Every structure is written in C-alpha cells, then in structure tokens.
Amino acid sequence: MAESDWDTVTVLRKKGPTAAQAKSKQAITAAQRRGEEVETSKKWSAGQNKQHTITRNTAKLDRETEELHHDRVPLEVGKVIQQGRQGKGMTQKDLATKINEKPQVIADYECGKAIPNNQVMGKIERVIGLKLRGKDIGKPMDPGPKK
C-alpha cells in the first residue's frame, strides 16, 4: 500500500508499433516528421539458402540464343494411337484406364501436344498392339517371349 500515495503518479503508456506497422510508409513518414532518425535498408536475399550459389555466368546465359523447347509427339504417332484404339473399339477413357493414366494424357498424345514419355508410350504400344517408337511406327508389334 506504499504506492497509493497522493504524491506518486502512475503513467500508462501505449505499446510501440509492431514490426509490420513500423515498416509501413505511413510510420516512416510520421517518424521523419517528428524528427526521429530513420534508417531504411533493403534486405537482400533474405530467407534463401545461400549454400548453393549459381555458378553459371548469367551474362553468358543471356547471350545464348538457343531455343529451349521440348519435343512433342509427332502427329503421325497420334494418328497411329487413334487408329489402333478405334480398331480395338476403345474410347480414350477406356485406353486411359487400361494403362492407368488420365484420359487427358491420351487426348494430348493423339493431338500431338504431349511430351513423349517412354513409359506411357510402352503401355499404349502393349494395349493397342502397334509400334509407336523407332523407324517402323504403326507396324504390328512382335509378340514377346512368353514367360
């Protein structure tokens, strides 16, 4: 009870601004108006793992004119897939479920938009029974050895 004197004064203060509020443009200009010292510095590469730096010369990469694009499935292969599938009386969805892929994958292969994947091509070859890779595209596949 020693502090309940008539002579003592209790001062209640507001909390200071949070980090997000202190960084705002308004807070900076207000501090400058009050005449406080304001230090602004841009964080550079904060929060990045700098153990692995880029070793390639970026100027050299800029000068390179090589076109970076992926090869697509030729339209010829798409037509062979379509004919083989229709010859077996299958829809795109049926073929997709047989090879455990999405129907969109089959559609992409047939219209020539897909990037060729040897695993998918092999699965399609086995189901429709036609070669899709190599020089004799569209020829019937040789029956493999029975195990």
Swiss-Prot record:
DNA-binding segment(s): 92-111
Keywords annotated in UniProt: Activator, DNA-binding, Nucleus, Transcription, Transcription regulation
Intracellular or extracellular location(s): Nucleus
GO cellular component: a single term: nucleus
GO molecular function: DNA binding
Sequence ranges of Basic and acidic residues compositional bias: 33-42, 59-69
The keyword DNA-binding is assigned to this record: yes
Domain of life: Eukaryota
A Pfam family it matches: HTH_3
Sequence segments annotated as region (Disordered): 1-69
Residues annotated as domain HTH cro/C1-type: 81-135
InterPro entries: Cro/C1-type_HTH, Lambda_DNA-bd_dom_sf, MBF1_N
Residue stretches of biased makeup (Polar residues): 46-58
Annotated function: Probable transcriptional coactivator.
Protein name as it appears in the record: Endothelial differentiation-related factor 1 homolog
Source organism (scientific name): Xenopus laevis (African clawed frog)
Upper classification of the organism: Eukaryota, Metazoa, Chordata, Craniata, Vertebrata
Protein's gene: edf1
